[in-house]
């Protein structure tokens, strides 16, 4: 029993140490310095989801913070301030072809995803900077696109997640889900134009 207790205590101490190291790394990023990258388990696990529309792949890479009994909206995530829409490094969205988001055009590429939450309306920001740590170094000058959407009450999601819903031949709704909130935004693709371009490229080769 004593040896088992020692093992459990040692494991708890090790996990606590890892959390402190991760917290230290994040604090250094907040201060603008670049810490040595540590390959350690994250408290907020990495997640990724991909949806294909026609020939176009849309991939969201993010980290998944947990509610953990906390008051999220307006507290952990303040209203009126830029939020990284996840945890740790930038949440990123990659489009393999040009798309529209909420009807507004956005060229193919990888973008840092940020939001500005509010009670009744959120701003979703696609930034040309996709490699920063969260939103701490966010610069409005690097915006590629901003759209406004409305949040909706939803079933509880203990860990933050992104999903694709209402998938159609030329569109899908990407949704951020966390706590009891869902934030949907529609992504559209000109499938005919993408297919025509693909066929032309194949004929050239």
Predicted segments, located by residue:
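Extended, well-structured beta-strand/loop surface patches
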Residues: 28, 33, 39, 57-108, ...
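An ectodomain-focused feature that recognizes extracytoplasmic/extracellular
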Residues: 42-52, 60-61
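Hydrophobic core
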Residues: 15-20
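Sec/Tat signal peptide C-region and signal peptidase I cleavage site
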Residues: 21-27
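Bacterial N-terminal signal peptides that target proteins for export
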Residues: 1-14
């Amino acid at each position: 029993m004593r040896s088992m207790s020692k093992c459990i205590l040692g494991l708890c101490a090790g996990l606590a140490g890892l959390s402190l190291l991760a917290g230290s790394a994040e604090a250094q990023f907040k201060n603008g310095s670049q810490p040595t990258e540590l390959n350690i388990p994250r408290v907020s696990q990495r997640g990724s989801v991909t949806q294909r529309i026609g020939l176009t792949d849309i991939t969201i890479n993010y980290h998944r913070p947990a509610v953990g009994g906390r008051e999220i909206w307006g507290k952990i995530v303040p209203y009126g301030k830029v939020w990284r829409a996840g945890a740790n490094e930038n949440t990123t969205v990659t489009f393999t072809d040009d798309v529209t988001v909420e009807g507004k055009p956005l060229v193919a590429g990888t973008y840092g995803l940020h939001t500005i939450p509010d009670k009744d309306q959120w701003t979703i920001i696609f930034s040309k900077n996709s490699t920063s740590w969260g939103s701490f170094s966010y610069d409005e000058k690097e915006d590629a696109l901003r759209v406004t959407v409305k949040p909706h009450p939803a079933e509880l999601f203990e860990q933050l997640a992104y999903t694709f819903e209402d998938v159609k031949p030329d569109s899908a709704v990407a949704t951020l889900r966390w706590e009891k909130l869902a934030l949907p935004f529609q992504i559209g693709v000109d499938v005919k134009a993408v297919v025509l371009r693909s066929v032309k490229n194949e004929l050239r080769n």
